[in-house]
């Protein structure tokens, strides 16, 4: 499945969740519902994936956790906030940089129309070798 197809499936899954339960719930509720929708669509995903930081050749664990990695190519961060702030987008970009994944989605469920709560970002930090679309992303663990 191509990256755009994966992101479309994730967005459609999120829209299904949002249309069923609406805005106003806690982030954890949306996480559980989205996991169900992704599994119904037979998408491979991991939840709460730890992201290490390599510092002077040493892998350190600062406690960063990504909400979802879907089909090993799309990073997904879930929010249920009144407004998406620059710090939320910076978090997404940092996670993309650390993971080496090509695309990230930030989905804020606390909006009337979900399309207004979706932000898609491309990882501009990938090395030339990693930017080859035929090369799988580096493993996270």
Task: State what each model feature region is.
Residues 1-20:
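Interdomain/boundary linker segments immediately adjacent to catalytic/signaling cores
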Residues 23-30:
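Hot-dog-fold acyl-thioester-processing enzymes
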Residues 79-130:
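Nucleic-acid nuclease catalytic cores
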